[in-house]
Design a protein with these regions (language model features):
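HotDog/MaoC-like acyl-thioester-processing domains
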Residues: 1-8, 88-135
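Hydrophobic beta-strand-centered segment that forms part of the acyl-chain substrate-binding groove
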Residues: 47, 60-101
Length: 135
């Protein structure tokens, strides 16, 4: 793999009601925060919010995009060892366009292990989630 410090990818996705409903179905997380308009209408959020873990799925997709973009004929497999310091700092609503910026910030040439910074922002530039990805 031609992955090095500075390797990066960006993913842009508009969150739909169908995304949230599909994620609720697959994950079996049907908490009212994510699926009940009436319930959330009575809260300070005013409407349903996307699952934080759905945002992590977008983080993973950005990681995969970076890996595919950086791939060459060199043998080797980069895998995810998990995410540290994950924070969901603002809600994401139906119709929000999220941009995931993923960048490798450290990579050990001998072991191939490293870490990446991941930031998710909404369409107005507010940070909605952050994480450190261990690869």
């Amino acid at each position: 793999m031609s992955i090095r410090s500075g390797s990066a990818a960006t993913l842009v996705h508009t969150v739909t009601r169908q995304d949230i409903e599909d994620f609720a179905r697959v994950s079996e997380d049907h908490h009212p925060n994510h699926v009940d308009d009436e319930y959330m209408g009575r809260t300070s959020y005013g409407r349903v919010i996307a699952h934080g873990i759905l945002l992590m799925g977008f983080m993973s997709a950005a990681s995969s995009r970076m890996l595919l973009d950086a791939a060459d004929d060199t043998p080797g497999t980069v895998v995810s060892y998990g995410y540290d310091r994950v924070r969901f700092v603002a809600p994401v609503f139906v119709g929000d366009e999220v941009t995931v910026d993923y960048e490798v910030v450290e990579l050990d040439a001998d072991t191939g292990k490293g870490r990446s910074n991941v930031t998710v922002k909404n369409q107005v530039g507010d940070t909605v989630a952050v994480a450190t990805h261990l690869i």
